[in-house]
Amino acid sequence: MKTPFERLALYDINASIKEGSYVAVIGHTGSGKSTLLQHLNGLLKPTKGQISLGSTVIQAGKKNKDLKKLRKKVGIVFQFPEHQLFEETVLKDISFGPMNFGVKKEDAEQKAREMLQLVGLSEELLDRSPFELSGGQMRRVAIAGVLAMDPEVLVLDEPTAGLDPRGRKEIMDMFYELHQRGNLTTILVTHSMEDAAAYADEMIVMHKGTIQASGSPRDLFLKGEEMAGWGLDLPETIKFQRHLEAALGVRFNEPMLTIEDAAAEIRALFQGEKTL
């Protein structure tokens, strides 16, 4: 039913993500990031166009028999993934996904043991209720449940929400290690410019339901004024770099995307490898 109050959550979306890449989708609140990610495994279906993952295609207006295949290939870790826990024990919770896709119980339980170790938890937790664990442990158990389904694509929707800086770094480092070890395609939806700069190969910038820009963190973070127009800030390290350049009258060749980048550039400057 048409209405003058109709509003499109997404429009003119045309993007291609390389297999094995780590892509950050960034945008201000309400830009359409979370709506986009829910299309990636068929939680939402497109009203126009199509979504393709390898040979799996979901088309608008058609009965799509490949939804189950798509949902196995694309694992989503939502904000506060611990809210997804529901089983009596950690073992049952992690095993549920694989068994739902037809994996035998004993194989699913073996996969659960492997995934629990992969996320840095002890097998001693397998028989415990997930609701007896600490918040950080619950989050890792929920992540293990997603990984147990052997996804080809891992979508992370603000996965560090509610964590302190140390916990956030631990979780993000873990995802990056999993990305490299498992040759996963990883899509990070985030408000954190620091996380996008530190981990992503490519970035997609969303604003008001459409894609405004895409490219490497290096290239996009050089467009400070455009980023501000899309309601986005720069990483703190790049802000620091600009203040330093203004104060010392120098110009660094590369943007300082991380603290490590900043330390290396400053060290080179004061050791005389860069001239004022």
Curated annotation (Swiss-Prot):
It is found in: Cell membrane. Belongs to the ABC transporter superfamily. Energy-coupling factor EcfA family. InterPro entries: AAA+_ATPase, ABC_transporter-like_ATP-bd, ABC_transporter-like_CS, ABC_transpr_CbiO/EcfA_su, ECF_ABC_transporter_ATP-bd, EcfA2, P-loop_NTPase. ATP-binding (A) component of a common energy-coupling factor (ECF) ABC-transporter complex. Unlike classic ABC transporters this ECF transporter provides the energy necessary to transport a number of different substrates. PROSITE patterns: ABC_TRANSPORTER_1 (PS00211), ABC_TRANSPORTER_2 (PS50893), CBIO (PS51246). One of its GO terms (cellular component) is ATP-binding cassette (ABC) transporter complex. The gene is ecfAB. SMART domains: AAA. This is Energy-coupling factor transporter ATP-binding protein EcfA2.
